């Protein structure tokens, strides 16, 4: 998300020194990627060891939740396998809230690999009333994400604006469910301000995140 907002900011009337600072932050993140990858793999290995020693479906379900968090945006095929394991465990436990949570994981993967139709079908099959507070926030964010990506790859300007409008409808809902001042809150607020063409405000908020 940081990269997306950064790229949007480069076309705005921003002082060169501010752009340089943001680019240095991005460059540092890229250079440190091998270190982050090694650390993440170590965390994944530790979770897999815990899974082999787990004794209950509840424990396994919780561990798979953590494992999904490590695989998302890292290995999408593994993330999908983990999400499906969560669905199977949730069904075995006959826990509808757990089932919906795991299905949202699958939707996230579908959206992440550009299978937007499949992701939307999963989202459309879930009712927000069947989710807890964190699940609703996650649910709204996946709708926002899929429409944002569909706008990015839309063939015509008309369709681009249509999908951007759909994504925008979810921004306020997401902001209202995030802790004021948190990074997630500030990043979503900056995206909203960019959409509203309040560029200076958006950049000031973005700078405060890093």
Residue ranges, per PLM feature:
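A "functional boundary" signal
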Residues: 2-210
């Amino acid at each position: 998300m940081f990269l997306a907002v950064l790229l949007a900011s480069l076309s705005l009337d921003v002082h060169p020194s501010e752009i340089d600072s943001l680019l240095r932050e991005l460059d540092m993140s890229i250079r440190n990627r091998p270190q982050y990858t090694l650390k993440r793999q170590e965390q994944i290995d530790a979770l897999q060891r815990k899974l082999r020693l787990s004794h209950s479906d509840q424990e396994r379900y919780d561990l798979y939740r953590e494992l999904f968090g490590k695989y998302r945006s890292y290995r999408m095929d593994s993330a999908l396998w983990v999400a499906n394991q969560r669905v199977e465990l949730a069904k075995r436990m006959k826990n509808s809230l757990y089932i919906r949570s795991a299905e949202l994981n699958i939707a996230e993967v579908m959206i992440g690999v550009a299978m937007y139709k499949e992701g939307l079908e999963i989202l459309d099959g879930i009712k927000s009333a069947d989710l807890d507070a964190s699940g609703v926030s996650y649910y709204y964010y996946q709708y926002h994400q899929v429409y944002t990506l569909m706008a990015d790859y839309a063939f015509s300007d008309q369709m681009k604006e249509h999908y951007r409008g759909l994504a925008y409808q979810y921004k306020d809902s997401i902001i209202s469910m995030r802790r004021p001042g948190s990074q997630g809150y500030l990043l979503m607020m900056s995206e909203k301000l960019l959409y509203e063409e309040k560029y200076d405000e958006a950049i000031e908020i973005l700078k405060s995140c890093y």
